[in-house]
Amino acid sequence: MKHVIITGTSRGIGLEMVKLFAKAGNKVLALSRNTEPVEGLKLKNVHTISCDITQEDSLEKVVEYIKSEWKHVDVLINNAGAILNKPFLKSSVEEFKNIYNTNVFGVVNIIQKTLPLMPATGHVVNISSMGGVQGSVKFAGLSAYSSSKGALITLTELLAEEYKENGHSFNVLALGAVQTEMLEEAFPGYKPPMLAIEMAEYIVDFSLNGQKYYNGKLLQVANSTP
């Protein structure tokens, strides 16, 4: 049984991961600003906290819960994300900041809070996008989103290097097109071949076993692009 934190659990891949981890008997801490979807499942061993990862005081509730109930964290999956599909010259600096606050600084925030509570075998899995991979197909209008996901990839590589003597593992998955509400927002009407549950199954397995084979690695998880 592992102690697993997942961010961005109100819908899509995050919600499916909560179900899968719980079904396998793991303890799950589901973090999202909207906790109702997870609470409605009434799953054993799943605890929800209404949390905004961009706010440090919001994460203090997470730290307090871990210290009082779990004592440690085995797996952290940074799945929460924000997207903006808007032409570059029409995107304000404030809009760029909002995307980076969730996709980069929010991830930094929660890793800094939870890493001291991880054993040497702990695994941090960051969820990026194929749009953030150098040399991959890019789409106009996603300059804020894709560049933030590129930053997340580099951050993961740097953390793996910095903590390689401690035993902690950091990996990043660049996801391709998946049938989620978030993709529908960016590409209205497009129906990718992969379902959220299918991608969730892959991420769950990787988060539990991937650190045996990878550290500081970018894995491209995609069989198509929009």
What residue spans do the PLM features occupy?
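N-terminal Rossmann NAD(P)H-binding glycine-rich loop of SDR-like oxidoreductase domains
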Residues: 10, 18
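Conserved glycine-rich Rossmann-like NAD(P)H-binding loop of the short-chain dehydrogenase/reductase
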Residues: 24-39
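The beta1-alpha1 cofactor-binding region of Rossmann-like NAD(H)/NADP(H)-dependent oxidoreductases
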Residues: 51-61, 93
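Conserved NAD(P)H cofactor-binding loop of Rossmann-fold oxidoreductase domains
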Residues: 79-85
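Substrate-binding pocket helix/loop in short-chain dehydrogenase/reductase
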Residues: 87-88, 95-97
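Catalytic loop of short-chain dehydrogenase/reductase
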Residues: 125-151, 156-157, 161-164
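C-terminal helical subdomain
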Residues: 165, 172-173, 188-226
